[in-house]
Each structure stands twice: as C-alpha cells, then as structure tokens.
Amino acid sequence: GVVDLLNEMADRTFRKHQAFTIAELFNWRKEDLESYIGDEGCFSSIFDFAETVINASPNGWYDQKPVEPEQYKQTVFDVQKSVGDVGYMANIIENHDESRGVSRYIPEGERSTEAKKMLGGLSFMLRGLPFLYQGQELGMENCAFPSIEAIDDVSSRDEYQRCLKVGLNEEEALKVVSHYSRDNGRTPFQWNDEKNGGFTTGTPWLMVNPQYKDINAASQIGKEGSIYEFYKSMIALRRDDRYEDTIVYGVTEPVLEDQKDIMAYFRRGEKQDILVIGNFRDEAAEVEIPELKGKTCQVLLNNGGTCMAVDGKVKLEALQGVVFEVKLTKKRTVV
C-alpha cells in the first residue's frame, strides 16, 4: 500500500541522512498515525491542517461560514487527543497556502493585540512542534485587496468567478475571496512604515498590505507588550530547561471543554503542570478548575491585564490568555 511506498522512499532518502521530514497529509486516520509519525514512521512529523478546513464547503468559498472559537477549540483538541503520545504534530496557525490566522480564527472586530497574542499562546504551547510563518509574529492580518486584479493566485481568481456565477456582485465576490485567498500570506513582509513597508524600493510582486503603517517589525521589536516580544517570550519558555519535561514532552489534557468560548488545557509533566487558558469572549469570565484548589499557580506568560488563580477559580479579562505553572506537591511518575 501507500505506507509501503513511503517507507521505501524513506529508506532510500531520508533515513540515510537522519533527515527531519514533515508531511503535508490531509484526512489521516488515527489508526494509521503510528505508520506515519511513530518511532518507525515514514516521517518525523505531519502538519496539522485540520483547523484550516473547518467549515470548508464543496460549493466553494462563497458557501463557507466563518470559524467560531468553539469550532477552533474542538478541532485542536480532537487532533491532540488522536495523536496522544504517538508522535509530534507540526502545529500551525497559518502558512503560505492559507489566509492569515488572526483573520481566520479571531472574530471580526476583536482582532486586537491582546487577542492575537492569546491565539498565538493557545497554539504555541500545545504538544507538538510550533511553526511560525513570516509575519505571524507581528500579527499581520488579511489584506484589503482593491480588486481581483490585485490577486495573483489562480485558485482565488477561480473562486471569484464562482462567486459571480452564483449571483454575488463584484464587491461581494471580492470580499469573499479576500478573506480566504492564499495571497494574504504572500504579501511582502512589513519591516517598517516606509514605502512598501521597507521591503523594497522597487515594485513588489504583490501589493503591500495597507496596514504596514501600523503593523510592522520596527514598531514592535524591543517594545514591551508587542506581539513580537510576546512570541519571543513564548520561544524562551519552550526552550527553558526547567519546563522541558512538561512543555516539550508532556501530554495535552483539555479542560473546561463545556465552557463556551473558553479554551483551556493542561500540559502534564513529572515536575509540574502547565495550564494554558484563553478567553475568546468580549467580556470578562470566571471559571472553576477544582484541581487547582490548594495548589500554587505562578503566571509564566500573560497577554495583558491582571489575572488571578485563587482557590480553584481563574478570572480572565476579555480576550485574555495566560500560561500558569501549577506546582505539584510531589513528583509525578509519567509512564
């Protein structure tokens, strides 16, 4: 079968050089994961594309509904549960073939700096290999393309024609395509607020996102509270030897799954637990996690605002995301 062919390819190529390989694989089955990314699997990892096809319609983009926070949460958790400790998925929010993650997974009108950091934290702290796509660390959003001629991607132009055929006018069709087009992830990187975002003095292959005046690297590097600095903090936390056992190797255990628009999970380790929690609501929330009672919780990362975990209750502001270290009373034996 296919796995036999992939193993032959791996034997003749990747394994000879101990190469690290990541597969683009859709519609995988749980029972096949061992063959793909287990200890003797064909690949080292698989990109997690499950979130990118939420609400996908065979009719096309015009029939695709916006992603709700609950859908994102459950899809992420379904993948984490299916993979378990078989191997490590390559976790993404966006890539060169997708629209910008903050525009896809954060409801319109709520794409603040805080919300973007919250989404980044919820994804970055999962079990697996976090991948950052250029511009993600700045919170780059989808581009407001002025016309279909500004879009280069052939599939996006096909979707535009499909929209027109089902009765949408040109403005409506452009709005649909602008939301889903892969060209959103291909606009020039926004280095500063100068012409063309500082990317080039020439003519770029695609238009520069007009938001470059406000969203650019120069305005965020070294600035306390910026999205860029938050991502640096997340990288530093994942590289911290004190938390390696939990964040790198620990299992993911979702909690509060019945709490609408609250996404929370534990990373379990021998030395400590890590609690990652985010509030997608546009208002403050208080949730109860009984196992926190009597335990010391220390904030490791916070996207802004005050946050308390007292007597098993966690208070979150609107669109707040927090990473806690939960200290264990005694060392846990992980099998």
Region roles according to the model:
Residues 1-335:
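Active-site and adjacent substrate-binding regions of carbohydrate-active enzymes
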